[in-house]
Amino acid sequence: MYPHVGVDASGLATLRATVKSAQDLLRGFVPTAYAVPALAAAAVPAGPCYALAEGSAVVGRRARSSSSGAAATTHRRPAADSDSARMMELVERAQAGEADAFGRLYDQYSDTVYRYIYYRVGGKATAEDLTSETFLRALRRIGTFTYQGRDFGAWLVTIARNLVADHFKSSRFRLEVTTGEMLDANEVERSPEDSVLESLSNAALLDAVRRLNPQQQECVTLRFLQGLSVAETARVMGKNEGAIKTLQYRAVRTLARLLPDDAR
């Protein structure tokens, strides 16, 4: 019913490169320049740990200041690219009761939701059940979804996240990522040696991710493996964007300490 879950090679490659940069920094001078961003004085250094944080705090302030005037004028849906506009059209049709439109939304987002749940629970059967329940709840609640800059996929992941939390509360099941099943490389042909080395490197990285605390683990999963933006991750996790950047920063630093040098 659901596709085989493979590693998002680009996401893992980016995470591995970010962790490698953090390891290099940890081997040299570090402490003061890399204080916790929320507490750092003056400008936050745009170091590698912020590679996926969508710009430094300065950039964020510039964007906010430039958009502050426009934000006060209207509350209409912002101009979006063609894909976003198409998705929102499907959402609106589904809200009007079109079953075909909801079916197309399912086709578009089921893989994303399934991957998120699978990375969290580590079992195919459980992931399939929770994915089905996610879309059942989404169908019941689709009338409550409003755009306001929020991606529909992030809304679905929020529902999935709550179901995963309920799953862990209602059982003794522990998060256990089945690394062997996730290491499915089927994009391009590589030499056997390269494939083995990449698999070993991915396995070590995923093992290190499993050893993060739950919030750091979820942040890394959403940001690197699911490819969500800082804003989307913040909405899914119920935090502000600054908290997500700090969480990501600490997670990457922890991974840099956990990951063996030969697994980079």
Curated annotation (Swiss-Prot):
The keyword Transcription regulation applies. GO terms for biological process: DNA-templated transcription initiation; regulation of DNA-templated transcription; sporulation resulting in formation of a cellular spore. Induction: Poorly transcribed during vegetative growth, highly transcribed during aerial mycelium formation, mRNA remains high during sporulation. Transcription depends (directly or indirectly) on bldG and bldH, in their absence bldN is not transcribed. Premature expression of this gene is directly repressed by BldD. Residues 105-172 are annotated as: Sigma-70 factor domain-2. Disruption phenotype: Arrests development; a bald phenotype, does not erect aerial hyphae on minimal or rich medium (MS or R2YE), still makes actinorhodin and undecylprodigiosin. No transcription from the bldMp1 promoter (also called whiK). Significant down-regulation of 17 genes. InterPro entries: BldN-like (IPR014298), RNA_pol_sigma-70-like (IPR039425), RNA_pol_sigma-70_dom (IPR014284), RNA_pol_sigma70_r2 (IPR007627), RNA_pol_sigma70_r4_t2 (IPR013249), RNA_pol_sigma_r2 (IPR013325), RNA_pol_sigma_r3/r4-like (IPR013324), WH-like_DNA-bd_sf (IPR036388). It comes from the Bacteria. Residues 64-83 are annotated as: Disordered. The keyword Transcription applies. Keywords: Sigma factor, Sporulation, Transcription, Transcription regulation. Residues 1-87 are annotated as: Not required for transcription in vitro. One of its GO terms (molecular function) is DNA binding. A motif (Polymerase core binding) lies at residues 129-132. Two forms of protein exist; a 35 kDa form in early growth and a 28 kDa form seen in later stages (at protein level). In liquid culture the larger form accumulates to higher level than on solid media. The shorter form results from processing just upstream of Met-87; the exact position is unknown. There are 4 possible start codons; mutation of the first prevents protein production while mutation of the other 3 (Val-44, Met-87 and Met-88) permits production of both forms. SUPFAM superfamilies: Sigma2 domain of RNA polymerase sigma factors, Sigma3 and sigma4 domains of RNA polymerase sigma factors. Belongs to the sigma-70 factor family. ECF subfamily. NCBIfam families: Sig70_famx2 (TIGR02952), sigma70-ECF (TIGR02937). A mutation in the promoter region (called R112) carries a GGAG to GGAA change in the putative ribosome binding site that reduces complementarity to the 3' end of the 16S rRNA; this is presumably very poorly translated. R112 colonies are white and produce long, straight, undifferentiated hyphae, with rare spore chains observed, sometimes showing highly irregular septum placement. Additional pleiotropic effects are seen such as substantially reduced aerial mycelium. The R650 mutation (Gly-103 to Asp) probably interacts less efficiently with core RNA polymerase. Sigma factors are initiation factors that promote the attachment of RNA polymerase to specific initiation sites and are then released. Extracytoplasmic function (ECF) sigma factors are usually held in an inactive form by an anti-sigma factor until released. ECF sigma factor involved in aerial mycelium formation, required for translation from the bldMp1 promoter. Expressed as a preprotein; processing and accumulation of the mature protein starts as aerial mycelium formation and sporulation commence. This is ECF RNA polymerase sigma factor BldN. It comes from Streptomyces coelicolor (strain ATCC BAA-471 / A3(2) / M145). The gene is bldN.
